[in-house]
Amino acid sequence: DIVAVESPSFPGILQALEVVGLRALEIPTHTAEGLSLEGLELALEQWPVKACVVVCNHSNPMGARMSDERKQQLVSMLAVAGVPLIEDDIYGDLYHSGERPKPARAFDHTGNVIYCSSVSKTISPGLRVGWMLPGRYMANARQHKYFSNLATSSIPQMAVAHFLEQGGYDRYLRFARQNYRQATE
């Protein structure tokens, strides 16, 4: 099966697709606008694309941030085509100007967006704690989670939950955003 991905793309996404026997179809990505919607539209016409993986907010390695209008167009295009959008919003909390950018999922009215995120880029990569809102793909997500690992370590999850409940995550993010803002000025 073919999965549309940003180009350039985070190597880990490409490796993950390869490990499970999927082919990556690279779609050009602009530094300012993110994934080329025109390129994706052409790919959907020419290839049997089964899914699309995108980092809409601060993509890696480009750092592109897709506008809300383009996110709406992306979600709509993929819903019409019947192709699920796998949104990796791992960098969404690390915005450093204005308000937190909306995820593409905010524009999803059909359950076609599978929203994924983690604390691996904000708190610590070693925690290996993430989450997914699979929309209408809940049954498939449960099955894949079950087969990929039967038991997730509860101690890191409990530590992250405590950090969130006590307000530590918000305090840390304010500090991190200030550092990113200063580094980019």
For the regions a protein language model found, what residue spans apply to each?
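Conserved PLP-anchoring active-site segment centered on the Schiff-base-forming lysine
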Residues: D1-P11
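Proline-centered loop/turn at the N-terminus of a beta-strand
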Residues: I2, R23, K50, G82-P84, ...
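Hydrophobic alpha-helical segments in the ANL/AMP-binding
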Residues: G12-V19
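Short beta-strand->loop structural element characteristic of the AMP-binding/adenylate-forming
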Residues: R23-T31
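Active-site phosphate-binding strand-loop segment of PLP-dependent enzymes
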Residues: E33-H96
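Conserved core segment of the aminotransferase class I/II
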Residues: H109-R181
